[in-house]
Design a protein with these regions (language model features):
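Hydrophobic transmembrane alpha-helices and their immediate loop junctions
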Residues: 1-178
């Protein structure tokens, strides 16, 4: 039973991650195509086959910010769907929890790290010509968002235990955590 729980949780973790990751890529590719930019992609990144002077402010802002916004919406919808199934012993709750966790971590992590290292959504803030102080405030908002995600998602993660266990006790709690 433990190995089945481990396998199910691992598979749903990976599926949720891939859904979030490739949704972001699909949004970038679709919007770059709308601006007439030639793009290519592989399993891990998107390549833009244009010169640096061909980028416009609107294109950068839309291409690099639409993915995280769509991911936030997807994570919010997954969390709402989780609360709909919270009393049911349905295993779909595990997938919904992982989708919302990955979505919120993707958004707030990219606000924090992308802004500091000028990658991903950080390009938007560079093209907005924000000062270093404003960029640091955005990075701190990303950090606070990550902390808020951890605080907010602790209860849904604990409530998802009824997907596998009828009652969470001291005997089966270590199996739930792993």
């Amino acid at each position: 039973n433990f190995w089945l729980i481990t396998l199910n949780s691992t598979v749903t973790y990976i599926l949720a991650y891939l859904l979030i990751f490739y949704t972001n890529h699909f949004i970038k590719i679709a919007l770059a195509g709308n601006f007439g930019y030639d793009v290519g992609f592989n399993h891990s990144q998107v390549f833009y086959y244009i010169e640096s002077h061909e980028w416009t402010h609107d294109a950068v802002k839309l291409i690099y910010s639409a993915g995280p916004i769509m991911i936030l919406i997807l994570g919010g919808l997954a969390l709402i769907a989780f609360w709909h199934f919270v009393q049911e012993p349905a295993r779909i709750k595990i997938l919904l929890i992982w989708i919302s966790l990955h979505a919120f971590n993707f958004l707030f992590g990219s606000l924090m790290i992308g802004n500091i290292f000028k990658e991903g959504v950080g390009h938007v803030f560079n093209w907005m010509y924000l000062t270093d102080t404003a960029k640091m405030i955005v990075a701190l908002l990303g950090f606070v968002g990550l902390l808020g995600t951890a605080y907010t998602m602790s209860k849904p993660v604990a409530l998802s235990a009824n997907s596998y266990f009828n009652q969470l006790s001291e005997r089966n709690f270590p199996f739930f955590i792993t």
